[in-house]
């Protein structure tokens, strides 16, 4: 029995996730925005050319591993690396979801070993697996999103967890960039703050 079957919610049937375009439909109607898109809209979109300009204008450029590469080659390498990381992150998410829903998982990656260490800690804390990849929504604000993992705490509350497969989680942004909208203008444009806002 899956966790969704074990712990159903009355609103589960009202929402549908569309992987293409990363959109949601609530009661058959597309929501205005996903939580992920809402957070991204508060910050400047990544501009590879601007970043490359900055790298090439540094005094230390000749020592960079990208030195001697064309702009196109640098961007192609970044794109390939990003696609690979995304695929591996998706696989890890899927394997964790399968694990908590009682399916057999074969994954010998170091990241999955980290997860199994977390699993030991989770049991020690008395956290009970409650839901995986739980799609939720807020009708008044036309928002929707997917919660990676929910656990029930010993005191009966629900704790939200978010799986991340990244090289580093940084509080300080590249170039000390800040958010571009009033609500986030005092928040650094770094993955730590992006992830925190998604969970808020």
Regions found by a protein language model. Give the residues of each.
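Catalytic cores of nuclease domains that cleave nucleic-acid phosphodiester backbones
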Residues: 4-10, 74-186, 193, 197
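Substrate-binding/gating loop at the entrance of the active-site cleft, primarily
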Residues: 200
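Charged, glycine-rich intrinsically disordered N-terminal tails and low-complexity linkers that flank
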Residues: 1-91, 184
